[in-house]
């Protein structure tokens, strides 16, 4: 996994798969490398301690070990009970789910058929050999965990583990595979051809349309428009992925940052996209390091949405999907960020995104929640509620999309469960005129989880579910569960080494 973090910042982190408790829900922020992970807060310490306590108490009642309990539906319920005890009743969960054998499993079984379309997933190519990535495990062996073996093994980020974590260990039905551009091509996770090849492989194996594909477009890079033409002709992506900030690792020395509303540079690409009928443009926004104003001078502005309104208005036939909800990762305490929201009603850059439809009179702007929701859910679920409320209020229920940024965070099932159970508190809804998120399979969450993406990608949900329910991956998952297979609860990013 590529990362923004400097050597000094890496010294303050540990690999999530070895440095954090394998809770059903992460008990501290896991960074995907695009931002600095906050130290574990006192509240998160309390949540972790309570989860461990319940696992020790309730595991024997279920006839399983602590590890077995934590990997079960009952363990997942226990994690949300613990979070409610610490943060207040933000998650819909009952004590019976954790305490009574079979109760949580029955609920999980009832929701297992839900249509979930994850529009942000990743893995790396088999021949990925960037020393900066392989060196993370070597560094971990030297500094964090001498017991690590096979430190040069990137299996956890590769194809087979991706299939297991996303399609077998979670309720995800359809996923969109993405990529990212870099000034140094040796950092490329997957080429456009490799993304398309993965789409062919998974759909051929499964016998259904399980995987969709991005093609990454890179304005200002040599030959970028020729690559667009080639992708339209031969790769035939389901949508496009762009990074207005250019290289997401470091401020581009090649000046590859750009604006969505650059009429001379980017509008000719939009013309080609409309003509080809590939009209969904996914854009990475937000998620900068803590010191972005100093470390990305003259570049960080390209991660904001200041360029979105005009482009969306000028190109009504295109759909602009802004990843991570444009949220800027906040390195101040969660309490301070929430206090600022309570005072002003605004969330930096995310509120700007949510206001664009009203300000510009457009209906073609969408927000994907990705890493933004994942980090909010584990550090301060009340803020997660504010974030979701802000996007739904401004963009509309039908323009917020589900994405997990997996496989960096392991199986996305914990994120799915967090969204299924999250509700915006009554007083927050009244003060900010937010709509309720509703039940796990209610109108709002059904739209977010899959209905909205299905509409963008021309997926007929009933037909898709019919095919998916009977495909090869569904059979593999059934056999896996019957044989006692369970989630690893592993995450693959970074966590802070110290507590707050």
Give the location of each predicted region:
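N-terminal secretory signal peptides
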Residues: 1-64, 91-92
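C-terminal segment of N-terminal export signals and the immediately downstream linker at the start
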Residues: 3, 56-63, 83-121
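Active-site gating loops and adjacent loop-to-helix segments of metal-dependent hydrolytic enzymes
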Residues: 39, 125-157, 251, 289-294, ...
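Mid-to-C-terminal alpha-helical segments outside catalytic/metal-binding sites
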Residues: 64-84, 104-106, 115, 131, ...
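Catalytic pocket-lining loop regions of alpha/beta-barrel enzymes
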Residues: 133, 254-402, 427-437, 441, ...
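Divalent metal-dependent hydrolysis catalytic cores, especially in the metallo-beta-lactamase
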Residues: 136-157, 164-187, 210-216, 238, ...
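Acidic (Asp/Glu)-rich catalytic clusters
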Residues: 164-171, 192-208, 228-236, 272-275, ...
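Active-site gating/metal-coordination segments in enzymes
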Residues: 182-303
């Amino acid at each position: 996994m590529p990362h923004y973090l400097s050597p000094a910042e890496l010294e303050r982190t540990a690999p999530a798969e070895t440095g954090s408790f394998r809770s059903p829900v992460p008990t501290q922020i896991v960074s995907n490398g695009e931002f600095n992970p906050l130290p574990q807060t006192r509240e998160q310490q309390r949540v972790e301690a309570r989860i461990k306590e319940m696992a020790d108490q309730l595991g024997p009642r279920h006839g399983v070990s602590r590890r077995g309990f934590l990997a079960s539906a009952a363990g997942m319920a226990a994690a949300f009970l613990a979070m409610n005890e610490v943060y207040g009743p933000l998650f819909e969960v009952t004590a019976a789910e954790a305490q009574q054998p079979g109760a949580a499993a029955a609920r999980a079984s009832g929701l297992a058929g839900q249509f979930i379309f994850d529009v942000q997933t990743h893995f790396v190519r088999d021949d990925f050999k960037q020393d900066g990535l392989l060196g993370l495990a070597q560094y971990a062996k030297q500094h964090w965990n001498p017991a690590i073996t096979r430190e040069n093994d990137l299996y956890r980020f590769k194809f087979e583990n991706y299939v297991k974590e996303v399609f077998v260990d979670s309720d995800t039905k359809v996923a969109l595979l993405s990529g990212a551009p870099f000034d140094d091509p040796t950092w490329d996770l997957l080429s456009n051809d490799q993304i398309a090849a993965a789409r062919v492989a998974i759909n051929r194996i499964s016998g259904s349309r399980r995987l969709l594909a991005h093609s990454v477009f890179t304005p200002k890079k040599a030959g970028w428009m020729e690559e667009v033409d080639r992708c339209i002709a031969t790769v035939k992506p389901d949508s496009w992925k762009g990074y207005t900030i250019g290289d997401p690792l470091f401020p581009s020395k090649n000046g590859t940052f750009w604006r969505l509303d650059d009429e001379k540079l980017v509008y000719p690409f939009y013309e080609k996209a409309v003509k080809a009928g590939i009209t969904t443009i996914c854009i990475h926004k937000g998620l900068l390091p803590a010191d972005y104003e100093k470390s990305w001078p003259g570049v960080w502005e390209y991660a904001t949405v200041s360029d979105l309104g005009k482009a969306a208005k000028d190109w009504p036939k295109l759909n602009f999907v802004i990843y991570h909800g444009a949220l800027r990762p906040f390195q101040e305490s969660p309490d301070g960020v929430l206090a600022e929201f309570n005072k002003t009603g605004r969330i930096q850059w995310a509120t700007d995104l949510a206001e664009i439809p009203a300000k510009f009179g457009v209906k073609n702007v969408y927000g994907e929640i990705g890493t933004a929701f994942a980090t909010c859910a584990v550090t301060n679920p009340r803020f997660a509620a504010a974030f979701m409320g802000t996007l739904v209020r401004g963009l509309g229920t039908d323009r917020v999309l589900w994405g997990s940024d997996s496989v960096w965070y392991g199986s996305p099932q914990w994120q799915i469960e967090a969204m299924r159970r999250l509700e915006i508190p009554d007083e927050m809804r009244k003060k900010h005129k937010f709509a309720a998120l509703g039940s796990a399979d209610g109108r709002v969450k059904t739209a977010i989880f899959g209905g909205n993406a299905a509409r963008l990608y021309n997926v007929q949900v009933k037909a898709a579910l019919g095919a998916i329910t009977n495909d090869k991956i569904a059979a593999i998952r059934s056999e896996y569960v019957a044989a006692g297979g369970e989630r690893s609860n592993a995450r693959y990013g970074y966590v802070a080494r110290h507590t707050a």
